[in-house]
Structures are given as structure tokens and as C-alpha cells.
Design a protein with these regions (language model features):
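Non-catalytic cap/lid and distal C-terminal segments of serine-dependent acyl enzymes
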Residues: 38-347
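Bacterial N-terminal signal peptides that target proteins for export
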Residues: 4-19
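C-terminal motif of bacterial Sec signal peptides marking the signal peptidase cleavage site
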Residues: 29-30
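Sec-dependent N-terminal signal peptides
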Residues: 20-25
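Residue-level detector of functionally pivotal "anchor" positions at catalytic/ligand-binding pockets or at interdomain
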Residues: 345-370
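C-terminal tail/sorting-segment detector
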Residues: 378-388
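Conserved beta-loop-beta connector loops within the AMP-binding
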Residues: 371-376
């Protein structure tokens, strides 16, 4: 508490801050415009989290990975038809997906595929070519350098859009489209991309997509992370690897990871446990310590960590970027690390040495702490102070 405030004044200011935050938008890619105030009915803190569960802190991407590699992949546009899954009476839409094809692509070989989903107001091209659509981004340089330096086996990356028109929309329409993207993903996008390139998909039937699941990953940032969780919830079996960044699952309601983390985690665990692939999946969950969406991600992650029969070291890990905000700097760093884990050149090297922090002795990021400190509070578990 600041020294120039009395206890009552501090509590009053904290409560005012909390109410303002609960009834306004943060102006970020995963915020609601409904302004509804909710009660944190089921905030999951460090209680009952296994003492050996560790947050894994990512390290910055080396600066040379943002430089152009000598062996550069290409960015190609794939267009495909898809239904409007928000309303069956509407006509089919013609949609773009931008595809990173690695240097030295050989049609006689098979390639793993990762799909990366943009956040709210984003477009399909921005991950690889920027909003202008004409400049290779830092993420593409990272792809090139990871492959050229032998840190990843060559892979194909796809940047689609869950938006039927590939343009910025209001929050309500965007969330409706994100909620049904899993149908397009399985029915339209996977067949369109993975039959055009040499992948592990041999037929476009549901059985064929299932048969190639071990070589497929999907991830996303912000509302793209929420969409990734929708895919996990609605089409879990069709992808083996998941990379949700700065966003939660909404099966229990909007921002369910923040408000109802234990119920959310149980729902996800129950879903996994009814699948024949309950021991054959991986979630690489990530957020920045200064991200305005940390409450959604962190509370859900800790709740998932309690359910060790389902989410354990073989199927789940939780990562943080120190000082990371709700921006592409964090996304690039998470992708840099996750891709080495998903597609290692040597399977034995998939688990790499990283800075770790035990939840039992480390920090607790609680919803009440976030709100009382302007959405960015880091509450030390011993309760002595709040950082920033």
C-alpha cells in the first residue's frame, strides 16, 4: 500500500479500480465490449496445485533469428470454399489462408503442419506478411532460422482466419465466428491445405484426418487462443498439439478461465478422458506476466495443473514471458520455443532446459490481485507485496 494512503483510502481506490476494469474494455485483442460486471465465483489460486508443478519461463528470441536467413521459405496463398457455420442459410464463402512452405520443400517427403490463429480485429495475412500483406514478419524469419539452424525439422505453417470475410468485425460477430471455427477447420481448411502440400494426410475423410493427427498442431493468440480452446473442446481428436497463447476456454461462459477455472478445467479433463487419445496430446499454454489477459490464462492453467491424471508433464506445460505484454513480441517468443518442442530434429531433444519456478514457492497471479492493481498486479504468495 502506498505510504501516503490510509487503509480506507487504499481500499476505496482499489475497489474503484476493480469496478472500472470490470465494466470497461482493455482495448486489446481478447476483450469484451459487453461491459458486464461479473463476480469471480471460482477463482483458482495456488491451493492444491501439485508442489512439483512448475511455471516455465521463456527466454528471449536471439536477435539473429529476426534477421533474414540464407535459406528462406516461401509464403503462398491458398483459397478455399467454406460454409458460413454461424448461419446455415447463408451462401458459402471464399476464404484465404497464408501458408509458409519451408526452404527445400520436397513433394516426395511428408511435413508436419501447424495452424496459427490471429486475435480480434486481425486478418489472415498479418502473422506472415503484416497488415499490409507485403512484408515478411519476424515470425517468418524465426521459422527460417529454426529450420536452417537445425533446431526444428522442416514444417508447414498456416495462417487462416476464423472470420468469414477476413476483415475486422465487432466483438459480438467475431466471437460468434470463433465459436464455430472448429467445423471449418476439420471440414474445409485441413482438407484444402493438406491435400495441396505433401503432408501426412492421405484422405480427407474424418478417419483420414484422425490418422494424421500426430503431425498436426493448432494454436492462436488472444481471441485466436480462445478459438484454439474451442477446437480443443469441439474437435479434440483431430490435432495432437495445442498452443493457446493469452486466452482461455469459454465452455463455462465468457472468460470462464478467469471466473470459473476449476469448473473449466474439470470440463476439459472430462472431455479428454472420454477420448481414445487421452494420453496422446499436448497443451503448451502461455502468457506474458504483464499481459492484460493473464487472469484468464493463469487461473485456468493452475486449475488444470491440479488434475494430474489428465494434465501432467506428459500432456501439459505452462509458460510465461517475463514482462511479456499482449502483443506480437510475446507471440513470437512463444512460437520460437513451442515449435522446437513440437517439431524437434531429434525427439530426445524435445525437452529443453528453461528457467522454472515452482508454484508452491513462487508467485500467485490472482484475479483479485489483478483488478486491485490495474490489471497487472503480481501478488507474491507470501502476501508481502504487489509488484507493479
Amino acid at each position: 500500500m502506498p505510504s501516503d494512503l490510509t487503509s480506507k483510502e487504499y481500499m476505496r481506490k482499489s475497489m474503484t479500480t476493480m469496478m472500472m476494469l470490470m465494466t470497461s474494455m482493455f482495448g486489446c485483442a481478447a476483450c469484451s465490449s459487453d461491459g458486464a460486471s461479473k463476480e469471480a465465483a471460482d477463482v483458482s489460486e495456488n491451493d492444491n496445485v501439485p508442489t512439483d508443478f512448475q511455471i516455465q519461463y521463456t527466454t528471449p528470441v536471439p536477435s539473429e533469428f529476426f534477421q533474414a536467413a540464407t535459406q528462406q521459405g516461401t509464403i503462398e496463398l491458398v483459397e478455399y470454399d467454406s460454409k458460413d457455420y454461424t448461419q446455415s442459410s447463408r451462401p458459402a464463402t471464399h476464404k484465404p489462408a497464408y501458408v509458409y512452405v519451408p526452404y527445400g520443400y520436397d513433394p516426395s517427403k511428408q511435413y508436419d503442419v501447424i495452424y496459427l490463429l490471429h486475435g480480434w480485429t486481425g486478418v489472415a495475412e498479418e502473422y506472415f506478411l503484416g497488415r499490409s500483406g507485403n512484408s515478411r514478419t519476424g515470425l517468418v524469419h524465426i521459422f527460417d532460422n529454426l529450420i536452417q539452424r537445425g533446431l526444428c525439422r522442416p514444417f508447414i505453417a498456416v495462417s487462416p482466419t476464423w472470420d468469414k470475410d477476413n476483415r475486422s468485425k465487432d466483438w459480438g460477430e467475431s466471437t460468434r465466428e470463433a465459436a464455430v471455427f472448429s467445423q471449418e477447420y476439420v471440414n474445409d481448411l485441413i482438407p484444402a491445405v493438406e491435400t495441396r502440400y505433401s503432408t501426412y494426410l492421405t484422405e480427407t475423410t474424418p478417419e483420414g484426418i484422425l490418422a494424421s493427427r500426430a503431425h498436426r498442431a493448432i494454436g492462436g493468440f488472444s481471441l485466436g487462443s480462445i478459438t484454439t480452446w474451442y477446437v480443443f473442446e469441439q474437435a479434440f481428436a483431430y490435432s495432437r498439439m495445442y498452443l493457446p497463447m493469452s486466452g482461455d476456454n469459454w465452455s463455462q461462459g465468457m472468460y470462464g478461465g478467469a471466473y470459473y477455472p476449476d469448473a473449466t478445467a474439470k470440463f476439459l479433463a472430462d472431455l479428454v478422458n472420454t477420448s481414445p487419445y487421452k494420453n496422446d496430446f499436448y497443451v503448451w499454454y502461455a502468457v506474458g506476466t504483464e499481459d492484460v489477459r493473464i487472469d484468464q490464462t493463469h487461473n485456468q492453467a493452475l486449475a488444470m495443473a491440479k488434475l494430474t491424471d489428465t494434465f501432467n508433464v506428459n500432456t501439459f506445460s505452462y509458460h510465461m514471458k517475463e514482462g511479456g505484454r499482449h502483443d506480437f513480441n510475446a507471440v513470437w517468443e512463444f512460437c520460437y520455443h513451442a515449435l522446437q518442442f513440437f517439431f524437434p530434429t531429434n525427439e530426445a531433444s524435445a525437452v529443453r532446459s528453461v528457467k522454472r519456478e515452482s508454484v508452491a514457492t513462487g508467485r500467485a497471479y490472482t484475479l483479485s490481485g489483478m483488478l486491485a492493481s490495474g490489471g497487472r498486479g503480481i501478488q507474491i504468495i507470501d502476501g508481502k507485496k504487489i509488484i507493479k
